[in-house]
Amino acid sequence: MSSTAVVHDDDLMEPSLQSIVNQKTLRWIFVGGKGGVGKTTTSCSLAIQLAKVRKSVLLISTDPAHNLSDAFGQKFGKEARLVDGFTNLSAMEIDPNGSIQDLLASGDAQQDDPMAGLGVNNMMQDLAFSIPGVDEAMSFAEVLKQVKSLSYEVIVFDTAPTGHTLRFLQFPTVLEKALAKLSQLSSQFGPMLNSILGARGGLPGGQNLDELLQKMESLRETISEVNSQFKDADLTTFVCVCIAEFLSLYETERMIQELTSYSIDTHAIVVNQLLFPKDGSECDQCNARRKMQKKYLEQIEELYEDFNVVRMPLLVEEVRGKEKLEKFSDMLVHPYVPPN
């Protein structure tokens, strides 16, 4: 059900994320699932474990809710900054609803940056807005800025809820098609458009259409390169996060099928908020909920027998702050053993 992953046979059935931490070839790790299942806690905790064995780790939130700041108790923005208490773990929060001008920005930015200087007039902005998933494009554009710097050994994505996550992963293909169409129109109507733009003073920044297309083509090449990395199981994997309930299990199955259709590796599932009532517990609600969770947990283990299924307990306190995240992260690599 998962695409081929580079894991040792001994790790294949291990109920932990240790195999992902051990896989030194990984460059991109996505963490996603239905809303409210603990994606941010899981992604932060996984990043903490990776920081123990990697030179540099970048944690990126593409969720508009931006819970990284709440999780670490530290304000993050669109520029990467070190997480307090770490020397090799940085974090950033991208606003996928940011202005399209940030992506197609005019102006005087560096000439060697494919993201820079993409000045557009209203016609080009209208074209950009017509591209499906343009809000996710904003996130992807910010990611590419980090990629070009080559300063992080591994990047962990704390993604938006399921539907947005999958659109984000599809965006490279969408943009490639859109730019191909734009290039085709330019070859057919380029002289006429340049004439019209010239009469109106040209594009912002004094560019002509050909220069704009060259910069957009450079961006397309970068996106294409990253997209190919996403489909390489040596470089990329997707960690699914869920809870032991019907809707969450349904969303997880749908997500795994779609990830597989896009050739994106996934071989790990984190099941959060599990109850482990003590033997003889008189809490009827606890016992009933545990019975329900056990049913869906068994279905998960049956459906995904070739996955690393990590069972995480429901905790009595919120997992916020460095110390609590570190304790939670230990359970991702050392399977939780419920008390007797």
UniProtKB/Swiss-Prot annotation:
<feature type="binding site">
    <location>
        <position position="286"/>
    </location>
    <ligand>
        <name>Zn(2+)</name>
    </ligand>
</feature>
<dbReference type="GO" id="GO:0000750">
    <property type="term" value="P:pheromone-dependent signal transduction involved in conjugation with cellular fusion"/>
</dbReference>
<dbReference type="GO" id="GO:0043529">
    <property type="term" value="C:GET complex"/>
</dbReference>
<dbReference type="GO" id="GO:0005085">
    <property type="term" value="F:guanyl-nucleotide exchange factor activity"/>
</dbReference>
<keyword id="KW-0256">Endoplasmic reticulum</keyword>
<comment type="function">
    <text>ATPase required for the post-translational delivery of tail-anchored (TA) proteins to the endoplasmic reticulum. Recognizes and selectively binds the transmembrane domain of TA proteins in the cytosol. This complex then targets to the endoplasmic reticulum by membrane-bound receptors, where the tail-anchored protein is released for insertion. This process is regulated by ATP binding and hydrolysis. ATP binding drives the homodimer towards the closed dimer state, facilitating recognition of newly synthesized TA membrane proteins. ATP hydrolysis is required for insertion.</text>
</comment>
<dbReference type="GO" id="GO:0051082">
    <property type="term" value="F:unfolded protein binding"/>
</dbReference>
<dbReference type="InterPro" id="IPR027542">
    <property type="entry name" value="ATPase_ArsA/GET3_euk"/>
</dbReference>
<dbReference type="GO" id="GO:0005524">
    <property type="term" value="F:ATP binding"/>
</dbReference>
<dbReference type="GO" id="GO:0006890">
    <property type="term" value="P:retrograde vesicle-mediated transport, Golgi to endoplasmic reticulum"/>
</dbReference>
<dbReference type="GO" id="GO:0046872">
    <property type="term" value="F:metal ion binding"/>
</dbReference>
<dbReference type="GO" id="GO:0034599">
    <property type="term" value="P:cellular response to oxidative stress"/>
</dbReference>
<protein>
    <recommendedName>
        <fullName>ATPase get3</fullName>
        <ecNumber>3.6.-.-</ecNumber>
    </recommendedName>
</protein>
<feature type="binding site">
    <location>
        <position position="283"/>
    </location>
    <ligand>
        <name>Zn(2+)</name>
    </ligand>
</feature>
<dbReference type="Pfam" id="PF02374">
    <property type="entry name" value="ArsA_ATPase"/>
</dbReference>
<keyword id="KW-0963">Cytoplasm</keyword>
<dbReference type="GO" id="GO:0016887">
    <property type="term" value="F:ATP hydrolysis activity"/>
</dbReference>
<feature type="binding site">
    <location>
        <position position="245"/>
    </location>
    <ligand>
        <name>ATP</name>
    </ligand>
</feature>
<feature type="binding site">
    <location>
        <begin position="34"/>
        <end position="41"/>
    </location>
    <ligand>
        <name>ATP</name>
    </ligand>
</feature>
<dbReference type="GO" id="GO:0044183">
    <property type="term" value="F:protein folding chaperone"/>
</dbReference>
<dbReference type="GO" id="GO:0071816">
    <property type="term" value="P:tail-anchored membrane protein insertion into ER membrane"/>
</dbReference>
<comment type="subunit">
    <text>Homodimer.</text>
</comment>
<dbReference type="InterPro" id="IPR025723">
    <property type="entry name" value="Anion-transp_ATPase-like_dom"/>
</dbReference>
<dbReference type="GO" id="GO:0009408">
    <property type="term" value="P:response to heat"/>
</dbReference>
<keyword id="KW-0547">Nucleotide-binding</keyword>
<feature type="binding site">
    <location>
        <position position="272"/>
    </location>
    <ligand>
        <name>ATP</name>
    </ligand>
</feature>
<feature type="active site">
    <location>
        <position position="63"/>
    </location>
</feature>
<keyword id="KW-0067">ATP-binding</keyword>
<keyword id="KW-0862">Zinc</keyword>
<dbReference type="InterPro" id="IPR016300">
    <property type="entry name" value="ATPase_ArsA/GET3"/>
</dbReference>
<dbReference type="GO" id="GO:0010038">
    <property type="term" value="P:response to metal ion"/>
</dbReference>
<comment type="similarity">
    <text>Belongs to the arsA ATPase family.</text>
</comment>
<dbReference type="GO" id="GO:0042802">
    <property type="term" value="F:identical protein binding"/>
</dbReference>
<keyword id="KW-0813">Transport</keyword>
<dbReference type="InterPro" id="IPR027417">
    <property type="entry name" value="P-loop_NTPase"/>
</dbReference>
<keyword id="KW-0378">Hydrolase</keyword>
<dbReference type="GO" id="GO:0006620">
    <property type="term" value="P:post-translational protein targeting to endoplasmic reticulum membrane"/>
</dbReference>
<keyword id="KW-0479">Metal-binding</keyword>
